[in-house]
């Protein structure tokens, strides 16, 4: 079976709930882009969408969110570019090696104010471990054979991750609440 993700394939290492953050680095051999995260990630998950950066040979990325105020480019920011300026999540990647360092939402969106990051780009240990798998069926759109999907979902379950074809129920509830508040169906403050 192909690799789901290096941090998932052989079991998941638990993170440290008191972890204070660290630095992410692109894969360039020199003049690496450095991004400092002043805190741990939340909602860390395996993502099968076609937009997220994935390690070579992996079917899924592992991505979490952190307040955009806790994210700062601390070295070689001149090497960053936005992969797709029309996307809701503006993924900032290294122009040279292609690694995505952070994704920022600048349009009106339920997750505006949160940046999407790949904690695996950090040498520090203690980041929140993956909590679930999202957009699992999306790997079919990238050429994965549909007949093998049950095995993928079972592999996630074996390591303790619930596979979803959207986001987790908690995140879907947040999106629905945001939408209801914007439309006036729910009060702005609950």
UniProtKB/Swiss-Prot annotation:
Residues reported in the UniProt entry to bind Zn(2+) 2: 47, 49, 52
The enzyme's main class, written as a single word, is lyase
As cofactor, the record names: Zn(2+)
Record-annotated CENP-V/GFA domain positions: 19-165
The residues that hold Zn(2+) 1 are 26, 28, 94, 97
User: What EC number is given for this enzyme?
Assistant: 4.4.1.22
The record's Pfam families line, in alphabetical order, gives:
GFA
Keyword list, A-Z: Lyase, Metal-binding, Zinc
- Biological role: Catalyzes the condensation of formaldehyde and glutathione to S-hydroxymethylglutathione.
Name this protein carries in UniProt: Putative glutathione-dependent formaldehyde-activating enzyme
Q: What is the lineage of its organism?
A: Eukaryota, Fungi, Dikarya, Ascomycota, Pezizomycotina
């Amino acid at each position: 079976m192909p690799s789901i993700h290096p941090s998932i394939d052989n079991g998941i290492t638990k993170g440290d709930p008191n972890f204070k953050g660290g630095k992410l680095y692109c894969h360039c051999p020199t003049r690496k882009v450095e991004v400092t995260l002043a805190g741990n990630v939340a909602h860390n998950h395996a993502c099968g969408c076609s937009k997220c950066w994935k390690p070579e040979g992996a079917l899924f990325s592992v991505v979490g969110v952190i307040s955009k105020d806790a994210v700062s480019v601390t070295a070689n920011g001149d090497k960053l570019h936005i992969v797709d300026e029309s996307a809701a999540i503006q993924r900032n990647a290294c122009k040279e090696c292609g690694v995505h360092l952070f994704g920022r939402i600048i349009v009106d969106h339920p997750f505006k104010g949160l940046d999407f990051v790949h904690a695996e780009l950090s040498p520090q240990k203690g980041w929140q471990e993956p909590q679930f798998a999202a957009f699992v069926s999306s790997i079919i759109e990238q050429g994965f054979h549909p007949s093998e999907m049950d095995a993928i979902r079972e592999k996630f379950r074996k390591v303790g991750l619930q596979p979803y074809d959207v986001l987790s129920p908690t995140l879907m509830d947040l999106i629905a609440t945001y939408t209801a508040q914007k439309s006036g169906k729910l009060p702005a403050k609950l």
